[in-house]
Amino acid sequence: MVKQVFAAFPQGSAAGPEKFRGQAAMAGRRARWDLAITGGQPPLRPLRPPVLYRAPLPRTKLEASVPDGQVTGMLEIDGRTVAVSGWRGTVGHNWGSEHADSWVWLHAADFGAAPEAWLDLVLARIRVGPARSPWTAMGALSLAGDRIVLGGLGRRLRVDARPGRLTADVPSPRARLQLSVTTDDGDPVAVPYTDPRGGSRTVRHAALASVELIVRRPGDRALTLSSSRGAYEYGTRRDMPGIVPQPLPEG
């Protein structure tokens, strides 16, 4: 995964929601990509109730334009070309005036017992004056075409979120989700995110996280799912001991 920040998109580049084309250079290495993504599912707007998209808080809004899609095209890394055909992928973006104080973004697919399933979940704490809010969860789990809304305002959850791992118990109207996430120390990258209001956040992103889920729904037996193809992002305004963020790549 490559994250870039531009005052304007370079000539010839494209950035979604259906087409991605660009290049980046960092630490003597170069990458180029030309990718298309298609998906038959409606976008996911996880903030609930929907009035939050018009409210002053939270100051970051987000959407998964393509919560689950198929990616085709090509990647080129240091001159080596990789053909991409039928890869699972997702497209999302966020906007606003201030990053959350701390957050987790988790996306997972290719669960062995339910290969069509996908999970897209955001956990966040925001700052209101001098205080920090409790963790709030918002997102969805898709099972057999049924999109189960997760979390929401006022729902108490248990969260232990760290740069390299996560455990959480997320209640929702139709299900309760227990999840754990672990990442390999050699997989992630860490970068700084500049905050529109000043300062920055340190963000650690792992693109090959292991995800374990237990889904409990009224009247059904508990369903256990696992995937080794999760994307786990942890961001915070606090320092991460032993983690030094690297500058974002040049276009």
What are these regions (language model features)?
Residues 1-251:
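Structured soluble/peripheral alpha/beta segments that form catalytic or ligand/cofactor-binding pockets
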